[in-house]
Regions:
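Gly/Ser-rich catalytic/binding loops embedded in alpha/beta enzyme cores
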Residues: 1-95
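Conserved catalytic cores of soluble enzyme domains
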Residues: 99
């Protein structure tokens, strides 16, 4: 899958292999539906910008209140599950998104 960490700098970057978790899911027959928005560079770019923002995807919003951001680096994963668009999602705990 293309992996850009929400940044234009990595556009077109393709990782050489699946992560351990993704390879286990595929082996078990899981179908991957896609990738979700995340804070640019997994929220490690700066402390002075809105969580859930990336140059590639723009500002991710809460599934229930469009005036707030969902917070955390894996914000798109949380929003997708919260909105019942997908049954489960994978995310990383980088800056509070797994709380």
């Amino acid at each position: 899958l293309d992996t850009c960490s929400g940044s234009w700098a990595l556009l077109g970057n393709v990782v050489p292999r699946d992560s351990f978790v993704v390879s286990k899911l595929r082996s078990a027959g899981a179908v991957l539906f896609g990738k979700a928005s995340l804070s640019e560079w997994a929220d490690m770019r700066s402390n002075n910008y809105s969580e859930g923002y990336s140059g590639r995807g723009g500002q991710c919003r809460s599934a229930y209140n469009l005036t707030v951001n969902p917070g955390g680096s894996s914000s798109g994963s949380g929003v997708g599950v919260g909105a019942n668009v997908i049954a489960f999602a994978l995310g990383t705990e980088t800056d509070g998104s797994g709380e």
